[in-house]
């Protein structure tokens, strides 16, 4: 029998650790009265939306200005004082207390990185205190849907030092019968792609998210991916499709999109994306237009919304207010979920809930600056999101999430359902 007093927050500690790019980030540990402990590390993005919650950095010379000592101090000196004595089971109350303590619209006083670290660590402490997995604690008895992975195997844009304008070219193994098989399929294509690139004399060095970063044009990248899928023994569009993260805000300036040597209006950009969808088995396009180009997004949705998943990342920044604006204007049909864009677990769950009630899909996502923390793997199963973006099939901070999903699938046994096998997630074109 678990005593409720055992689940009361007793101590909170924090430290500065490193992410996958060698930059400092925040780790928090929440210890409960009964001895259970939860630990979490927050990620950090390279291409960040202008409307994201504020990530607190120290400035100055230390770590080239990227230290997080202030955020760590806020946790140990202010957040700990406010939260000790609260029940870890009341996630909403814990997060609300931190938001009230911060008092800003974008978490700029305490830092979203400080608040999120404690928020995630609290949930893990509660799960550990109850002796149940995190996905079960967050999702209850219906948490059994394994997500379709969107595997970023060719990196460009802000994630790689190459000529590729679009940020991510992803494999989507929706035709697999299980997550384990989806992972195998993606891995086999990844290694086939590596050999293809090597045979063509191209670089097989990897970018921030573990994908290859060759000097290619956007069309060439699509062509070599389709070739790799076929050479690995799979059917493009039927078993494995493609997804893009255009990250178009990165090359949007003065009302025009500059990429592949051209300069395009919003309408012309939509036309470029339409051509790619006609040419390749693309089932999902993320940030096809810039974060504040609402008119362009509306046109994109009218033209392609019935054919492919249109994901708002910089557009929505995991924020219910911006998502509601999209819903009200019939803009996009999917939201990318990044816990550090909004900065607390409760607000993340609220965004996923609003999306689901409004007919929008949710894609749980990592950041380019990641760590060994696997919270998002559990979150994807807990929320039955049906899709996850967590990078390529290399670099241990990416693979850690895939391995956690394998463990969850094994633990669920016959109760496990792969989203692709039941028609959830982005659909292929046979």
Swiss-Prot record:
So what EC number does this one have? 4.2.1.11
Presence of the UniProt keyword Signal in the record: no
Molecular function in Gene Ontology: magnesium ion binding; phosphopyruvate hydratase activity
Q: How is the cofactor bound?
A: Binds a second Mg(2+) ion via substrate during catalysis.
- Its GO CC terms? cell surface; extracellular region; phosphopyruvate hydratase complex
The reactions it catalyses are:
(2R)-2-phosphoglycerate = phosphoenolpyruvate + H2O
- State whether keyword Lyase applies: yes
Where along this sequence does the record place binding of Mg(2+)? 245, 286, 313
Question: Pathway it acts in?
Answer: Carbohydrate degradation; glycolysis; pyruvate from D-glyceraldehyde 3-phosphate: step 4/5
> Which PROSITE patterns does the protein's record reference?
ENOLASE
Q: Which domain of life is it from?
A: Bacteria
Identify the cofactor(s).
Mg(2+)
The record's family statement is: Belongs to the enolase family.
Q: Sorted alphabetically, which NCBIfam families does this protein's record hold? A: eno
| The protein's name | Enolase
Species of origin? Synechococcus sp. (strain CC9605)
């Amino acid at each position: 029998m678990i005593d409720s007093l055992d689940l009361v927050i007793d101590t909170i500690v924090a430290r500065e650790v490193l992410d996958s790019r060698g930059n400092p980030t925040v780790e928090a540990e929440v210890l409960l009265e009964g001895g259970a402990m939860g630990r979490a590390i927050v990620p950090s993005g390279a291409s960040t939306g202008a409307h994201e919650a504020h990530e607190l950095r120290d400035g100055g010379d230390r770590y080239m200005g990227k230290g997080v000592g202030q955020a760590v101090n806020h946790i140990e000196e202010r957040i700990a004082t406010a939260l000790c004595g609260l029940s870890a089971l009341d996630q909403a109350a814990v997060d609300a207390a931190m938001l009230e303590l911060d008092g800003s619209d974008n978490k700029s006083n305490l830092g979203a990185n400080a608040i999120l670290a404690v928020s995630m660590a609290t949930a893990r402490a509660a799960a550990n205190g109850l002796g149940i997995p995190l996905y079960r604690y967050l999702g209850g008895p219906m948490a059994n849907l394994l997500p379709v992975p969107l595997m970023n195997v060719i990196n460009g844009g802000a994630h790689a030092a190459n000529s590729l304008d679009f940020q991510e070219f992803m494999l989507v193994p929706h035709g697999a019968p299980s997550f384990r098989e989806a992972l195998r399929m993606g891995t086999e294509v990844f290694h086939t792609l590596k050999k293809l690139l090597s045979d063509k004399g191209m670089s097989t060095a990897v970018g921030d998210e573990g994908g290859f970063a060759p000097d290619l044009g956007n069309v060439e990248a699509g062509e070599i991916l389709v070739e790799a899928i076929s050479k690995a023994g799979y059917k493009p569009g039927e078993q494995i499709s493609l997804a893009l993260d255009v990250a178009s805000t990165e090359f949007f300036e003065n009302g025009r999109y500059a990429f592949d040597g051209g300069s395009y209006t919003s309408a012309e950009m939509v036309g470029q994306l339409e051509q790619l969808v006609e040419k390749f088995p693309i089932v999902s396009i993320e940030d096809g237009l810039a974060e504040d180009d609402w008119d362009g997004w509306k046109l994109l949705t009218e033209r392609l919304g019935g054919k492919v998943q249109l994901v708002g990342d910089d557009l929505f920044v995991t924020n219910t207010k911006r998502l509601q604006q999209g819903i009200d204007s019939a803009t996009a049909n999917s939201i990318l979920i990044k816990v550090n864009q909004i900065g607390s677990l409760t607000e993340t769950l609220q965004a996923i809930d609003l999306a689901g009630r409004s007919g929008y899909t949710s894609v749980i996502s990592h950041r380019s600056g990641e760590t060994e923390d696997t919270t998002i793997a559990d979150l994807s199963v807990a929320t039955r999101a049906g899709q996850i973006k967590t990078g390529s099939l290399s670099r241990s901070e990416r693979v850690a999430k895939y391995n956690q999903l394998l463990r969850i699938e094994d633990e669920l046994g016959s109760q496990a359902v792969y989203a692709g096998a039941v028609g959830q997630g982005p659909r292929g074109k046979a």
